[in-house]
Amino acid sequence: MAWYDNAVFYHIYPLGLCGCAHENDGQPVPGAFKKLDAWAEHAAKLGCTAIYIGPLFESGSHGYDTIDYRLVDRRLGTNEEFKQFVAACHERGQKVIVDGVFNHVGRDFFAFQELKEHRENARYRDWFCDVNFWGNNEYNDSFSYGNWGGFNLLVKLNQRNPEVQNYHFDTIRFWVDEFDIDGIRLDAADVLDFDFMKGLRRVANEVKPEFWLMGEVIHGDYSRWANPEMLHSVTNYELHKGLWSGHNDHNYFEIAHTMRRLQGLCHDTRLYNFSDNHDVERLPNKLRNRDHIRHIALLVYTLWGIPSIYYGSEFGIEGKKEWGSDWPLRPCLELADYTDAEKTNPVTSIYAALGRLKAECPELSWGEFKELTLTTQSYAYARVLDGKAVVAVYNNGDSPVSMEFQLPVEASGVEDLLADCVGSQPILTQVEWGKLKVQLPSNYATLLRLVG
């Protein structure tokens, strides 16, 4: 199997983590890549085998208004420093994935600057969508153009143009040759041209064995993007929504239905599972009961898919959009502030334990998913492989819950795999006549190994 089939990702938004200026002043933050390497090493201790870092390349502001695809953002450092960062990750056994922002560019991108200067006679006029010289915009360009999301800061590229396609294909080749990256997260993949993505897959297959393509897709049938001809995976926003709203509404049917639907659509495709990221508010700001962070971490790691952590979420930090700005979701953090977190912070403790278990329990990567019991308040399922099983059990209610279900494999007892975590509570279990009885405290979840 490919490396990404049992990977655990750690997602870093580098401009935020390093405290870079929000508008590109060309001034690097001293020691930015040294800091990023320390966080990648921290991620390795949590069991994260892959680093998704981005946006990374030269831009005017937040990183998604790309100016130069082949120059690391000067606020972070140099190409050579990023090359060394990747090499250090590889030495730890971590893969490195970067953002590929191929749908749009910033206004300072060379081809758009040429369009502004030469207008109707521009060499790169056809690199962009819906250019209209009878229109205008807030920049007073005396022409209008296609954009992403209504923002003229983000100029829409014409992905049907073979020159644009080849420019991006060559960019991928450059990234692999120069930095030795292992894959790309495609920004705004839900609006990328399908034939263009097929071309990206052909290049991915060419540049490096098991080079991984993951797309940012919000809604729809994910198998339209994640399939053998296009992308290996997409962001699982459907599950993300169910994770927090299913707990706020005390409704495990939402999460269970989501998993059934996705398995029916995507079959064996491993979607990219996450609880929060650089675009959505952090769990503590969305959950009505923060005890449910434990439940959601367990779900992300034990349901079918590829688990991930967004930097800082392993400490349970807050993050809420302010006045429409995403910067509060992308804070500058210092590892020194969390030195003893694994020993004192229940959230950190649970993530560290799940990282270890992901490496130790092949059932969590390869095991068949079996739903065992389901109510609005309680949920249990197993991951079964070669006659062995681990069972995840959940209670989202304010009172204890008892559940009973048929054992998925023969067993005479159970082991609580999260019993030693900070904040864990004792549970009551009984194996009898081929069934498992479990009594869980209120608002509690854990992972059991069937033994004997």
Residue ranges of model-derived segments:
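Hydrophobic faces of well-ordered beta-strands that scaffold small-molecule active sites
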Residues: V8-H11, I51-I53, V96-V98, I184, ...
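Active-site-proximal helices and loops of the catalytic beta/alpha 8
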Residues: H90-R92, Q113-K116, D187-H267, E318-A353, ...
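Substrate-binding/active-site clefts of carbohydrate-active enzymes
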Residues: M1-F9, Y13-T49, L56-R173, E178, ...
